[in-house]
Design a protein with these regions (language model features):
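Acyl-donor-binding surface of acyltransferase catalytic domains
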Residues: 1-30
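Conserved acetyl-CoA-binding loop of GNAT-fold acetyltransferases
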Residues: 126, 148-159
Length: 185
């Protein structure tokens, strides 16, 4: 089993852009992804390092339905034509937008690309008629994630403990994924 503390955050008014670097060779773009392409990017952004596993264990048809839903938008940061970030905005709840998945690959960590991506995310979310932009993160994620979301204008609203079968033991993720989290056989 693997346990994590999940923190839920929300933003109820648009936050202003925060300073982001001008990154040569990095371009924000829509992401057109089939299930395999999406899972590859999902793994590079979150599954390998941070134990993101929900979409890795989801049935292909269920994931395809989400990816093809007109109320779900996907975006990325392209570096030399290769997707190196994942931004998934979910507008399926009336009046709200969930920042469903957000992150950059190790190739962009520490470059300021996350700030650039968040500025785009916030603008895109609030272009729609919403009153709430929300996200959740957990203690399995990058140690700077919670602080980053707070600096981006999100406010914590609650926490929960989640316990799930360890995806490294069920075969969903490789044994070397999430090396910061011990495996308890």
């Amino acid at each position: 089993m693997v346990a994590t503390v999940v923190t839920y955050l929300e933003m109820t008014t648009p936050a202003p852009d925060r300073p982001a670097p001008d990154l040569d060779g990095i371009r924000f773009a829509p992401l057109e992804a089939d299930v395999a392409t999406y899972r590859d990017l999902f793994a590079r952004v979150g599954a390998q390092d941070w134990l993101w596993f929900s979409r890795m264990q989801m049935a292909d048809d269920d994931l395809a339905a989400i990816l093809n839903d007109p109320d779900v938008t996907l975006h990325t940061l392209l570096k030399d034509g290769t997707p190196e970030a994942l931004l998934e905005l979910d507008f399926r709840e009336d009046g709200a937008c969930e920042l469903a998945f957000f992150g950059v690959t190790p190739a962009l960590l520490g470059t300021g690309a996350g700030r650039l991506l968040m500025n785009h995310a916030t603008r895109l979310a609030w272009q729609r008629l919403i009153t709430r932009f929300h996200v959740h993160t957990c203690t399995l994620d990058h140690p700077g994630a919670l602080g980053f979301y707070r600096r981006s204008g999100f406010t914590p609203i609650r926490q929960e403990v989640e316990i799930a079968p360890d995806p490294r033991l069920t075969g969903v993720l490789p044994k070397d994924a999430g090396s910061h989290v011990p495996i308890f056989p």
